[in-house]
């Protein structure tokens, strides 16, 4: 009987894999068939839903300052960079005032556009905000945003949400070397593998991500990119 146990586990695993693959394919089809131009009219509603629930901590962190748009961000910091830096988890010189310490560990980060300023919230390994950086107009006018090739984990994360998600590298100007982040036209953390389970939530996340890109580009032409849902 023991000889059959590995076979049973393999059969169960394959069955689950095919089930999830089929489920994800159906969800992606629903997302791909969405009229995003019509959905974009709901951007303010979707942002409010997020900020009143899962992302309510961003409202607390911003205090009295308004939130025009927001997005998730991840470090562009791979294994090679970690080895080169001697496995450091901090990097100096990443702010607008003085010398502070910016996490290079793969923790979630949040971008909030408020007026002319872009706020970057860095989190610790417990998911709590432990640093708050503000990039003003002068910094943002000298920053860059470019589309990047879809490969590896970046590609996997984007394609899990249909055909309308693109990835970008945002290089934010500082006194020293730029802060380089990976962002998407959707609410995604590159290094937190997550399988979308609700097509409507995916649509909402895509609208919020595109709204962030649009507002950032409208305010700063040097940070303007074509919106995937309109191309």
Named regions from a protein language model:
Residues 1-21:
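Alpha-helical transmembrane anchor segments and their immediate juxtamembrane flanks
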Residues 3-9, 173-231:
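Terminal and domain-flanking low-complexity segments
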Residues 22-24, 32-33, 42, 52, ...:
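Detector for Asparagine
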């Amino acid at each position: 009987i023991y000889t059959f146990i590995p076979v049973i586990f393999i059969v169960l695993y394959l069955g689950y894999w095919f089930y999830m693959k089929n489920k994800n394919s159906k969800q992606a089809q629903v997302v791909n068939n969405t009229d995003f131009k019509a959905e974009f009219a709901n951007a303010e509603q979707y942002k409010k839903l997020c900020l009143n629930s899962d992302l309510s901590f961003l409202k607390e962190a911003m205090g009295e300052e308004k939130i025009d748009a927001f997005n998730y961000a991840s470090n562009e910091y791979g294994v090679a960079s970690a080895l080169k830096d001697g496995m450091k988890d901090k990097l100096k010189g990443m702010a607008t005032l003085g010398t502070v310490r910016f996490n290079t560990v793969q923790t979630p980060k949040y971008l909030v556009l408020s007026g002319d300023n872009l706020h970057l919230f860095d989190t610790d390994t417990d998911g709590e905000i432990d640093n708050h950086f503000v990039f003003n107009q002068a910094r943002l006018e000298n920053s860059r945003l470019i589309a990047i090739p879809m490969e590896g984990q970046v590609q996997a994360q984007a394609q899990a949400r249909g055909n309308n998600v693109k990835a970008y590298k945002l290089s934010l100007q500082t006194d020293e070397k730029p802060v380089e982040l990976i962002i998407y036209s959707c609410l995604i953390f590159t290094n937190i593998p997550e399988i979308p389970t609700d097509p409507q939530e995916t649509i909402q996340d895509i609208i919020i991500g595109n709204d962030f890109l649009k507002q950032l580009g409208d305010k700063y032409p040097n940070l303007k990119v074509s919106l995937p849902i309109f191309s």
